[in-house]
């Protein structure tokens, strides 16, 4: 319940701050599904199908943010909220990795790839039609689809999800049968 409440509060705060612009970010697409996932856990409903979609993106978002975006991020800006940043680019990954009752399989790699590809297609259409963030800037500095950098990062994000999903499915989850454990919330 703690993860669900934390993510829901952060989401509502972000929604008030960014308004309708919130869903131009891959982070919030993923966070939306993470809130649904933890909500389903709370209600005792099956979550396995959703877990296999969002685990790899949560890891890619965390690593991608801290390795690619954070070094260029205007941390001194008064609009930066470090708690919001830590929750949406780290805590969510930790929350999902601690869900030991869940398993993902290599054969499910298409799920995070489809999710990421749908987002990439949306972002290309959004930016291509002149869409910007609430500050009037591109949603991401690399979302320049009139230049090679935009396409390179789109492919890198998709490929990163492929590698992460295969890696996690291969190394964290062995071929041993899943052990029934209570849901950790």
Identify the residue ranges that each predicted region occupies.
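Alpha-helical transmembrane segments in multipass membrane proteins, preferentially the mid-helix core
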Residues: 90-107
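Non-transmembrane, juxtamembrane loop and terminal tail segments
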Residues: 177-185
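Interfacial segments of alpha-helical transmembrane regions
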Residues: 45-57, 105-114
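Juxtamembrane "helix-exit" motif on the non-cytosolic side of transmembrane helices
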Residues: 12-19, 66-76, 128-129
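Membrane-interface transmembrane-helix boundary segments in multi-pass integral membrane proteins
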Residues: 127-172
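Membrane-interface loop-to-helix entry segments
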Residues: 81-91, 152-156
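Early transmembrane hairpin module of multi-pass membrane proteins
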Residues: 1-49
């Amino acid at each position: 319940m703690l993860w669900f409440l934390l993510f829901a509060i952060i989401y509502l705060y972000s929604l008030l701050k960014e308004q309708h612009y919130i869903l131009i970010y891959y982070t919030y697409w993923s966070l939306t599904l993470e809130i649904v996932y933890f909500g389903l856990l709370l209600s005792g409903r099956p979550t396995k199908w959703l877990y296999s979609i969002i685990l790899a993106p949560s890891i890619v978002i965390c690593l991608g943010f801290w390795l690619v975006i954070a070094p260029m991020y205007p941390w001194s800006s008064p609009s930066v909220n470090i708690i919001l940043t830590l929750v949406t680019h780290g805590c969510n990954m930790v929350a999902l990795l601690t869900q030991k009752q869940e398993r993902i399989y290599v054969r499910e790699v298409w799920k995070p790839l489809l999710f990421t590809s749908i987002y990439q297609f949306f972002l290309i259409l959004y930016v291509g039609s002149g869409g910007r963030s609430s500050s009037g800037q591109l949603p991401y500095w690399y979302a320049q689809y009139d230049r090679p950098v935009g396409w390179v990062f789109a492919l890198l994000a998709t490929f990163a999800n492929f590698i992460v999903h295969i890696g996690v499915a291969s190394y964290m989850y062995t071929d041993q049968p899943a052990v029934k454990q209570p849901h950790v919330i």
